[in-house]
Amino acid sequence: MSRTIFCTFLQRDAEGQDFQLYPGELGKRIYNEISKEAWAQWQKKQTMLINEKKLNMMNPEHRKLLEEEMVNFLFEGKEVHIEGYTPPEQQ
């Protein structure tokens, strides 16, 4: 059975995660406050960031950068800036 949460990213009730996807306190916050839909949006941005900036997830500095971008996107409402990318709605 799915859980319904108030998603702080979408600002509405939505289906919550099935399990904690990220470790630690931040992971608990994501589990309790971020819906599946919002997480899917983040995953698309994350993939673009990793590819465009050529991030290596074995590098602790790259992981830290990605985590900062994730917090900014999911909790602070900041858009992820990817050089050279223009969203379709702005073209």
Curated annotation (Swiss-Prot):
SUPFAM superfamilies: YggX-like (SSF111148). Pfam families: Iron_traffic (PF04362). It comes from the Bacteria. GO terms for biological process: cellular response to oxidative stress. GO terms for cellular component: cytosol. One of its GO terms (molecular function) is iron ion binding. InterPro entries: Fe_traffick_prot_YggX, Fe_traffick_prot_YggX_sf. Keywords: Iron. The keyword Flavoprotein does not apply. Could be a mediator in iron transactions between iron acquisition and iron-requiring processes, such as synthesis and/or repair of Fe-S clusters in biosynthetic enzymes. HAMAP family: Fe_traffic_YggX. Belongs to the Fe(2+)-trafficking protein family. Monomer. This is Probable Fe(2+)-trafficking protein. It comes from Cronobacter sakazakii (strain ATCC BAA-894) (Enterobacter sakazakii).
